[in-house]
Amino acid sequence: MEHLPMAFNTTNPLIQVEDDRTGLSVETLKRALADNLFYLQGKFPAIATKNDCYMALAYTIRDRLLQRWLNTFQTYLNCDNRVVCYLSAEYLLGPHLGNNLINLGLWEPVQQAVEESGLSLDELIDIEEEPGLGNGGLGRLAACFMDSLATLEIPAIGYGIRYEFGIFDQEIKDGWQVEITDKWLQLGNPWEIARPESAVLVKLGGHTEPYTDDQGNYRVRWIAGSLVKGIPYDTPILGYKVSTANNLRLWKSEAAESFDFQRFNVGDYYGAVQDKMSSENLTKVLYPNDEQIQGKELRLAQQYFFVSCSLQDMIRIHLSDNPTLENFHEHFAVQMNDTHPSIAVAELMRLLVDEHHYEWQRAWAITEATFGFTNHTLLPEALEKWSLPLFGEMLPRHLEIIYEINQRFLDQVRMKYPNDGDRLARLSIIDEAGEKSVRMAYLATVGSHAINGVAALHSQLVKETILKDFYELWPEKFSNKTNGVTPRRWMVLSNPRLSNLISSRIGDGWIKNLDELKQLEPFADLAGFRQDWCKVKREVKQDLARYIHTRTDLVVNPDSLFDVQVKRIHEYKRQHLNILHVIHLYLQIKNNPNLDVTPRTFIYGGKAAPGYFTAKLIIKLINSVADVVNNDPTIGDRLKVIFLPDYNVKFGQRVYPAADLSEQISTAGKEASGTGNMKFSMNGALTIGTLDGANIEIREEVGAENFFLFGLTTPEVEKTLAEGYQPWEYYNNNANLKAVVDLINSGFFSHGDTALFRPLMDSLLGQDPYLVFADFQAYVDCQNQVGEAYKDQENWARMAILNVARMGKFSSDRTIREYAEDIWAIKPVVIELEDLCPDGQCLLISPNK
């Protein structure tokens, strides 16, 4: 025993993990970095790649996280507090390293340790692959919420799917989006820890059969057609300058039996691994294309898989410290992030009734008290519905349970609204019109004690439109929780120059209490501060200009107005309205070469769903316009158009700080909230936008005079459509619009091919469901105001400062506090690191536990 290092002295009842794992000094960090490079990567510095060095640094930082993570877990086990479990199909986390350095407060010592080791921290941070676990705002919101939950010291577990290939990497070839496999895991993920000992089995397919149990009770048994194993992978999510590190648990699918030795022995080599291949497909990619029936089957199986794994995991955790599930809802508050996890309502009922033999009424009371449901969309196509044949084939027991839930629910409705058959049809979880289907948003609504929207307008529209009848039935269930974003990633990490400038004037308390930004307001009137502000902005714009040059070879003028629209490509987000304005500007300059226009750089980014042809055609149009404009010598620096491929969190961290103008131009009433609008405003961009989503609340906070408003309101949109909207009339009566559309149709941007953009133009001229033509002139006029305003740089800077100063409401910390108080009934639990680690540098572990 005397030859063992002190850390492994098993004669001591308390094992002291050596300081290199937890120490925070520069020398300790350098030593840990070298050790991890040698012992974990197996490399000498002379032969180590940059990725080896990144991995070694990541493991060094992860060691510091593990100390906090395990202390958090131990504290939660020892307290009787409720835990929020967040069910989300997406977590758009972004790279971990930089964020963890910010939250640990270790940026400076780590930077020094890395530089003294002959490396560059910026280069190592830039190497990290972005986790391919999300697509858009839904996943990024989940990531911001996880950050805020930990920062506010609220016990939480995030549950989701460990996608092997994420959504896709986007490349642009000949102007078209091309989807490339996102191999984000190919070089390893140092932040996760596999927990195969906590694997669970998930049933799919098969049939059900009734039976009578030993007590004479009627029961139903689900005989599965196949079994899939769920393997959890855990990632610590650390709060900002607290000791709380909550758990993100993501599930990977594997075959229950991955290799059939008998089939292999008789030469059936493919058959021997067939189960392995089909099972692992469940967690290969995010949102598989569901145009074909196989894609629909995979999506439903994927959603059910992660929900079942997560609920089984919660039950296992609960029963480890409780004799029954009677108080399950007192220990877990489960929040469903949109409709993807809504099958959880039926699954918890199945687990309670079939597996744990609860009577229906008691099981339902537990279920309803457990769940909350966040609605994120008003678009009918995004409100998931599954056809009964598909649903019944894949989840036969759940369909029976949903029928029972629906029957009991409609019985209640009949009692309150007798002789109202139309209302019953509108409220039924089963849609009887056309192909019969299960309405998942309705299942989530019926099975939850709380339903919320994500912006004031959105929540109101939820109550007035898609869930109107439910609101009339249960008004007390509905509330609004306006979204927010974390200032740690979107200001401190993304924009350190601006963050340091702000902190130099008002201190750094705003990082945890964003309302303190209000203290900036008086500085907007100080010429010296405005000068410092503009200096920071120009430096950040120069950074983005260099990045654009690296990616595209284009040289852009950092003194031009950076006009930015980066988000998922969708018709309702109206990237095509934006590019129509670009073409209008181009025509103005071509027709009047001496025109005094504010130089602009239009920057686009975003992905189109693989099966969404119109969105892909919009990307092609943007790139085709860019090709013409950027190569026209008569235009020069007055107009540049850039589409930067593969928009993700990393991309966002570059572009949000550099933007002058934030494009938030969705059709009023279509965007639930939006969070990009908040990130832009927090970084000093002014907004041009409609009265939609959180734009309304941003405008209320920053002041109407600091917001460029245009377009029809939601009631006006509804009225225009109801009166028989004729986009052709707008085209005929607006010379500017007609000139733009005619130029596109002439083949000017498509090498003479008049058919290329015809589907998009025909759609706008014929239907224009998102009122692009109706809002075109108002948008052009508002953009003219923007151009004039930008010429007065002093006043523009003042407006930008006030935008930032008034963004306190839009921290995700505020949002999470509201959820915790109004829906989850959860209080913070402070993690005292020194209780388990008296000197703050070690972790005490009992070998008997």
Swiss-Prot record:
Pfam families from the UniProt entry: Phosphorylase
Annotated catalysed reactions: [(1->4)-alpha-D-glucosyl](n) + phosphate = [(1->4)-alpha-D-glucosyl](n-1) + alpha-D-glucose 1-phosphate
Residue runs in coiled coils: none
EC number(s) stated in the UniProt entry for this protein: 2.4.1.1
Gene3D superfamilies: Glycogen Phosphorylase B
Reported cofactor(s): pyridoxal 5'-phosphate
Keywords: Allosteric enzyme, Carbohydrate metabolism, Glycogen metabolism, Glycosyltransferase, Pyridoxal phosphate, Transferase
GO cellular component: cytoplasm
NAD recorded as keyword: no
GO biological process: glycogen catabolic process
Function statement: Phosphorylase is an important allosteric enzyme in carbohydrate metabolism. Enzymes from different sources differ in their regulatory mechanisms and in their natural substrates. However, all known phosphorylases share catalytic and structural properties.
Protein family according to the UniProt entry: Belongs to the glycogen phosphorylase family.
PANTHER family recorded: GLYCOGEN PHOSPHORYLASE, GLYCOGEN PHOSPHORYLASE, LIVER FORM
Protein name, entry field: Glycogen phosphorylase
Species this protein is from: Synechocystis sp. (strain ATCC 27184 / PCC 6803 / Kazusa)
Gene field: glgP
